[in-house]
A protein has these predicted regions:
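Bimodal "functional hotspot" detector
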Residues: 2-329
Length: 329
């Protein structure tokens, strides 16, 4: 009798469990639809989600001619992201392979280690291993110091860098670069223009790589000019004057003159003479020339869009939103 009651009790328990499970498995149409995969996003949305986990920042490299070249890189967010960014400037097989696609070179010599970095009140104290002192020549040494300072200054919390090597501050590096005091980012690729005076204004103008080069990029050059103050007009005129170094180029058609510059609600209209229209016949150079003009105008506050005119009429494809970065890879 007791055995029969036990069997009955077990049966009742099993039935109750089955009832509970079946109740939980019954869902409304709305509940069922909510369980369908909802995390499938479009390609653009996926990029937006991914972008939350990376920082777009400018990293400086150097080319064979000794110019510093800014490149936008996407750095995965992590604690100490400034240090992670700086690691992308160290010569290594991985970085070499990456830079090969750009035709550029790393700033910090192979074997360099970042021993430590602290940031306080805008000052980054950067401790590098002794390998960082072994740049191949004076130009590379100068580029290393300025390029690192420029790269770190892309972070709002950093405006100057105190270099240390093996935990100590040194007065000068192998080729004479003074690093005894904190380094502030200075004028990138500084040159002195023709007819300039020591009191002349500074403008940053962009030139591009040779049209027959394997790699296309634009290079900022800080030029001291004869004018007392810098303006969009004086800067664009320097673009027309072209680079002083034959390793760079500016393929604006010969005879092009600047007729005027106007600004209206963030839109800058740059009016060139009729010769500029011949740029359309240079398909390889055209995008580089246009971007060089745009980036040159961008340095001035309030510029949101650049409209390029030829004899007062809009150049085909001449209204372009201001690019955020000079070079992107």
């Amino acid at each position: 009798m007791l055995k029969g009651k036990s069997v009955a009790l077990i049966a009742i328990v099993v039935m109750m469990l089955l009832f509970i499970v079946s109740c939980n498995s019954i869902k409304t149409k709305e509940e069922f639809e909510e369980e369908l995969p909802q995390d499938v996003v479009s390609e653009g949305e996926a990029e937006d989600v991914e972008d939350k986990n990376v920082r777009e920042t400018v990293v400086y490299y150097q080319n064979d001619a000794g110019y510093l070249v800014p490149v936008m890189r996407r750095i995965p967010w992590e604690e100490g992201i400034a240090k992670a960014t700086l690691r992308m400037t160290i010569d290594s097989p991985e970085i070499q392979q990456d830079l090969m696609a750009m035709g550029l070179k790393a700033l910090l010599p192979a074997g360099t280690q970042i021993r430590g970095m602290s940031i306080k009140d805008g000052l980054a104290k950067l401790d590098l291993s002794k390998e960082a002192m072994e740049c191949e020549n004076a130009v590379a040494e100068h580029n290393m110091v300025q390029g690192v300072a420029l790269t770190l200054a892309e972070f709002d919390s950093i405006d100057r860098v105190q270099f240390m090597f093996e935990g100590k501050i040194v007065d000068k590096l192998k080729y004479g670069t003074d690093v005894s005091k904190p380094i502030e980012p200075q004028d990138v690729n500084l040159e002195i223009g023709s007819n300039a005076s020591s009191k002349g204004a500074k403008v940053t103008v962009f030139f591009h790589s040779k049209p027959d080069a394997v790699y296309d990029y634009i290079v900022p050059v800080t030029r001291i000019i004869s004018a007392d103050s810098a303006s969009i007009e004086t800067a664009i005129q320097e673009v027309l004057n072209g680079p002083s170094d034959d390793s760079l180029s500016m393929d604006i058609p010969a005879g092009t003159r600047l007729l005027g510059v106007k600004t209206d609600n963030g839109v800058v209209s740059i009016n060139f003479s009729k010769e500029f229209g011949n740029l359309a016949q240079l398909p390889q150079s055209e995008p580089l020339v246009l971007k060089s003009i745009i980036m040159t105008a961008k340095q001035f506050p309030g510029v949101e869009k650049v409209k390029i005119l030829v004899e007062g009429k809009e150049y085909d494809g001449g209204e372009v939103s201001v690019s955020a970065f000079a070079n992107e890879y």
